[in-house]
Amino acid sequence: VYTLPFFPGEKRLGKLRRRAEHFPLAVASAERLREIPADAFWALTAPLNIGPAPIVGDAVLPEPMLDTFFKGRQHAMPVMIGSNSDEASVMAVFGVDIAGQIQKLRRERRFGLGLIKLLYPGVKGDEALGREVCRDMAFTTLGYVVMQAQQRLGQPCWRYWFDYVAEAEHETYLHGAWHGNEVVYVFDNLTRAEPVCQYASKADPAFAAQVADYWANFARQAGTQCSELTGPVPWPACQPGRARLLPRVL
């Protein structure tokens, strides 16, 4: 997931020992850890957690996902992939200081930072620029990389950019749609999901229905003989040399 480094399997033993000391366990083993309820793990923070990327190098995940795509060993199948406009909302959970990343570039790669700024005209301040750069490096870039990988296998790819914010949440989500905000729209369950069901306007479920239809049409129509998904706005698949994108911008 993302373009963040995966967690090397050889480091997991150190994590296991630290977790055993944290709970505490008399014997530091995977078997003893599995006996602990799952709810005890989700709230763990560094250095006890392994997020946001998974462990790699074992039977479950032998190599990093991106390596598989670069080597062309992924399944040959249509893909839908995209990102949200404020994916940087989750960077603090990842342990990333978005303003600090820009400050580091200024110290170590001043010329490179100058080039990066050309890609974001009008964006002022380290935090604002860091939000844009970290979002694109960790999330937006991944969609482009996967698109190219599937095209090399002769498979179509549909990319999206999700920027819809519920009408009652504009003051909360000042920079756009947060990481994961698209899920309730994809599954069209705004009227059932908390807390959005408490304040969803008439326009919000209407938009969610359109989003869900695109996803359903992808499941029904996507294939090597399909170049466009039907919907309120026809959604063409990306073509070699043409990186098409379905936007939703408020």
Model-predicted segments: where are they?
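Non-catalytic, well-ordered alpha-helical segments in soluble enzyme domains
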Residues: 204-226
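Substrate-gating cap/lid region and adjacent catalytic-acid/histidine neighborhood
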Residues: 3, 26-202
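Stable alpha-helical elements in mature extracytoplasmic
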Residues: 12, 16-19, 29, 142, ...
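A generic structural signal for well-ordered alpha-helical segments enriched in polar/charged residues
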Residues: 22-23, 148, 152, 213, ...
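Solvent-exposed, acidic/flexible segments
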Residues: 13, 139, 204-208
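Fold-level recognition of mixed alpha/beta catalytic cores in primary-metabolism enzymes, strongest
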Residues: 1-21
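Mature extracytoplasmic/periplasmic domains
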Residues: 221, 225-250
